[in-house]
Amino acid sequence: AKLDFDRSKEHVNVGTIGVH
């Protein structure tokens, strides 16, 4: 789930879960 994680990271740039 690396791609999903990377995609989520960019999608959650404003509400990141501590993974900037």
UniProtKB/Swiss-Prot annotation:
The keyword GTP-binding applies. This protein promotes the GTP-dependent binding of aminoacyl-tRNA to the A-site of ribosomes during protein biosynthesis. This is Elongation factor Tu. The keyword RNA-binding does not apply. It is found in: Cytoplasm. Keywords: Cytoplasm, Elongation factor, GTP-binding, Nucleotide-binding, Protein biosynthesis. The gene is tuf. Belongs to the GTP-binding elongation factor family. EF-Tu/EF-1A subfamily. Monomer. GO terms for molecular function: GTP binding; translation elongation factor activity. GO terms for cellular component: cytoplasm. Its main location: cytoplasm.
